[in-house]
Regions:
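Secondary-structure end/capping motifs
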Residues: 249-323
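Sec-exported extracytoplasmic/periplasmic mature domains
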Residues: 57, 87-88, 106-109, 131, ...
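Pocket-lining segment of extracytoplasmic ligand-binding domains
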Residues: 98-100, 179, 183-278
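Short, glycine-/small- and polar/acidic-enriched structural segments
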Residues: 25-183, 201, 207, 222
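Conserved C-terminal helix/tail region of periplasmic/extracytoplasmic solute-binding proteins
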Residues: 317-336
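C-terminal motif of bacterial Sec signal peptides marking the signal peptidase cleavage site
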Residues: 16-19
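Bacterial signal peptide processing site
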Residues: 21-23
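Sec-dependent signal peptide recognition
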Residues: 2-10
């Protein structure tokens, strides 16, 4: 819990600092932004890094008037580090949760951090030691561990419980059989300990961590959050979880357009090169379990990696943000 609170405070601090010196600068012409010799994209380990695999390790070079522009992909320790490094200029771009992207856009005041694409389309699952028949009412009286409670996983879990008319509290002691108790945890190791030790029977986390934790606990997927989301928002609704945020004061538009064109091939690359994924992740700096998994079609299906422009997904993005009580950003937020 202490780690979670510290992480939440860090994110709030970063966003507050970004708001200092607020001014309206939404009419940035990033077609005139100078072209650098290299750009860096940051991402937290997990599905965000998988969405960049075909760019990593020299996978993408942009050429303009005989100038070669390289692209580096690097893994950050946690979501706070990704946000901080984007704001302080260490990263030129980053894969961020959509809700974080909207908050940074509004809080910066300069509106230079804009969404180019959506790359992760729902990787959240509930795993369990027993089945719930895809009915969240069967979680009443249970403790559910949640990785990323202060971010998208927690927002979506609470939203879906509310949509199902289920009361919840934050804590690890289930005293009311009519409530669900959500317990924030830092990551996979705590989930493994909780499931194996009997402290919980259920946990919310994202793929590919789902595969890694399931293999060490005997748990299985009992609820697909993407499907549960569609029950309340329509069968054609799209779960827009994370996307590419660009600092348009630092990155040239033509370069980003070329990069996005390349990223649209990432999904096909993943399925055609499952054996190369671990090495690609390692080249980004990944040292966690996801760089050691044996990837297959089932895992990739659950990772929901793709690349669609932000403008084409605007209606879905705004529905996702509104459902999670995040203030909708202005039109210039959608830069491609």
């Amino acid at each position: 819990m202490k780690k979670f609170v510290a992480l939440l405070i860090s994110i709030v601090t970063v966003l507050t600092l970004a708001a200092c010196g607020k001014k309206n600068n939404s009419e940035i012409d990033w077609t005139k932004t100078s072209l650098k010799s290299s750009y860096t994209i940051g991402a937290v380990e997990g599905a965000p890094t998988l969405s960049l695999v075909n760019v990593a390790d020299g996978g993408f070079t942009y050429t303009d008037n005989d100038k070669n522009v390289t692209t580096d992909v690097t893994v950050a320790a946690d979501a706070t580090a990704v946000v901080a490094n984007l704001i302080n200029g260490t990263y030129d771009m980053a894969i961020l949760p959509i809700n974080n992207a909207a908050e940074i856009y509004d809080n910066s005041g300069k509106h230079e951090f804009r969404l180019a694409t959506v790359n992760v389309f729902g990787v959240l699952y509930m795993i369990g030691k027993e089945d719930i028949d895809e009915n969240m009412n069967n979680l009443k009286g249970e403790v559910v561990y949640c990785v990323g409670f202060g971010g998208t996983p927690g927002l979506v879990l609470k939203h879906l419980l509310e949509k199902n008319g289920i009361s919840y509290e934050v804590g690890d002691n289930a005293t009311d059989k009519n409530k669900v108790y959500i317990y924030p945890v830092a990551g996979g190791p705590e989930v493994i300990q909780g499931l194996n030790g009997g402290a919980t029977k259920f946990a919310v986390l994202g793929e590919p961590a789902v595969t890694q934790v399931s293999g060490k606990t005997g748990a299985s997927v009992v609820l697909d959050f993407k499907k549960e989301w569609q029950k309340f928002h329509g069968a054609n609704s799209t779960f827009t979880q994370a996307g590419l945020v660009v600092n348009v004061n630092k990155v040239n538009k033509k370069y980003v357009e070329a990069l996005v064109g390349h990223l649209k091939g990432n999904k096909a690359y993943l399925y055609a090169n499952t054996d190369k994924i671990p090495a690609k992740l390692t080249s980004m700096g990944s040292t966690g379990p996801i760089s050691k998994l044996t990837y297959n079609e089932t895992i990739l299906d659950r990772c929901s990696s793709d690349c669609k422009t932000a403008t084409s997904m605007r209606a879905n993005i705004e529905a996702f943000l509104a459902a999670n009580n995040v203030e909708l950003p202005g039109g210039s937020f959608y830069c491609l």
